[in-house]
Amino acid sequence: MSYVFHRHCHATLPIIDKGEGVYLFDKQGKQYLDACGGAAVSNLGHSHQAVKKAMLEQLERVPFAHTGFFTSDSSERLAELICQHMPEQFNHVYLVSGGSEAVESALKMARQYFVESGKPEKKQFIARQQSYHGNTLGALAVGGNEWRREPFKPILHPSHHIAPCYAYRYQQSHESELDYSLRAANELEAKILELGAENVMAFVAEPIVGATAGAVPATQGYFKRIREICDQYDVLLILDEVMCGVGRSGSFFAFEQEEAEPDLVCMAKGLGAGYQPIGAVVANDRVYQAIADGSGFFQHGHTFMAHPVACAAAVATIETIFQDDLLTAVNQQSALLRNELTSALADLPYIGDIRGKGLFVGIELVADKESKAPLSKATLADKRIKQRAMENGLMCYPMGGTIDGVNGHHILLAPPFIIQSHHIDELVGKLSLTLKEVAETWK
């Protein structure tokens, strides 16, 4: 009997024993190639010596000091490092323990910004359908993942949603990429006008939609137009880079590849690379200064925020990314991964789309390529692919509800940045085998 309240009450899970590089090993000695980083977390693999050394050094000095009494060298260094890789108007970092906490903090920061600025009537959030921003109540309320939201709708704060920027499903055949980008982005303006600009606080979006829709990148010009709309109506832009940030997309921040800068950006997952739970909100000077010059106190906080050991792990993670030139590695290996996936999978009748940026790749499954009709829910494609992949020694991240929270299936890949070409060969080979085996059950 297990005394752990598992995610699934009836799950029988292998017991993890150790990790080495891109591999995990269970207690039975079975080896798994980690092609998803758990959930886009393990950017440096599972046994990086520099990160472990930094954590041990911090533990030997002091493991914990409450931020109501002290700051720490590791938190000060981490905030400085993050800001060094941000545009110049970003100079303050709020450190928390994970992605949901980061999003919750950003939502409250946006609200307090407008209260301190003399606009307390601004209280509405707008986000996108098929988005995911966390499982705590505020983050769940702005998120557009219907399956996750459904049981808790009666207790969620009302938020508003527009269509996602999802070219594979919604770009029309006669539209150019830019035309589609503008049409999708202009939904935000329409929603702001519907609600009244004086009531709208912020727009929340993932630069690359993560697990809910499967590494869906924005089309060219989309976020440029979003930024223009936010500026026009005095709406803050909150970008959620919890999954796609910290180098995952091929740049340290995914928004660097867009023609827009946020007011607040959320980070987590890869920030600590799985060695410690940590998250952050980076605020621009406009938001920070309004609070600093107003009450001077952000009315928020968590016990373990800016945890010294977690910050030490994150410092070592960021330093490793740049010292080892891992952004170059991400871009090189992502090109190889996309090429091999296309070669092995693109012609299969149930592969609809292979997309993403950097080492953040989504594979959308369909019943029919031409119509893009989804697989039937009865196939249980996501669950069967995950199970079979594990049996084949591969960890990937399949999900259902890709299109609307109910229909559609995809597989998310987010391997460690240290992945090598022979690992990619193994990944694609095992994934191809898994898909072909599971597809036999769909007939």
Tell where the protein language model's regions lie, with residue ranges.
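Conserved N-terminal phosphate-binding loop of PLP-dependent enzymes in the Aspartate aminotransferase
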Residues: 1-443
